[in-house]
């Protein structure tokens, strides 16, 4: 399933997309790092809420972490591990994606 064009995601930035995973429609966070893209479910492990403060609008700390808009949990962007806040030691649920020919696809 095609999720996005790579160029539609700013380098070092985020995008929110909807995808079918199994039988469920899920909101995903896409994070672009050069020609790589990492993806996670748009759900904070602390309280099960979306991480964006408005649809598709994500907070990034000075340290380069994704910050949950609800309770301030901070997630590093390599594996999605929570490094600060109420769910420290937990992690975002990763979703496998791949970049092919300038497009981001669900793997």
Q: PLM features: residue spans?
A:
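Short cysteine clusters
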Residues: 44, 68-71
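Axial heme c-ligation environment in periplasmic c-type cytochrome domains
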Residues: 85-87
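N-terminal pre-ligand scaffold of iron-sulfur
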Residues: 1-62, 76-77, 91-107
């Amino acid at each position: 399933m095609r999720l996005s064009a790579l160029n539609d995601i700013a380098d070092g930035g985020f995008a929110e997309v909807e995808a079918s995973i199994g039988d469920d429609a899920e909101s995903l966070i896409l994070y672009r790092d050069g020609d790589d893209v990492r993806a996670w479910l748009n759900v904070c492990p602390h309280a099960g809420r979306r991480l964006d403060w408005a649809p598709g609008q994500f907070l990034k700390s000075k340290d380069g972490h994704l910050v949950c808009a609800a309770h301030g949990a901070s997630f590093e962007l390599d594996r999605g591990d929570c490094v600060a806040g109420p769910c420290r030691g937990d992690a975002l649920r990763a979703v496998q994606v791949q970049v092919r020919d300038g497009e981001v696809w669900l793997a």
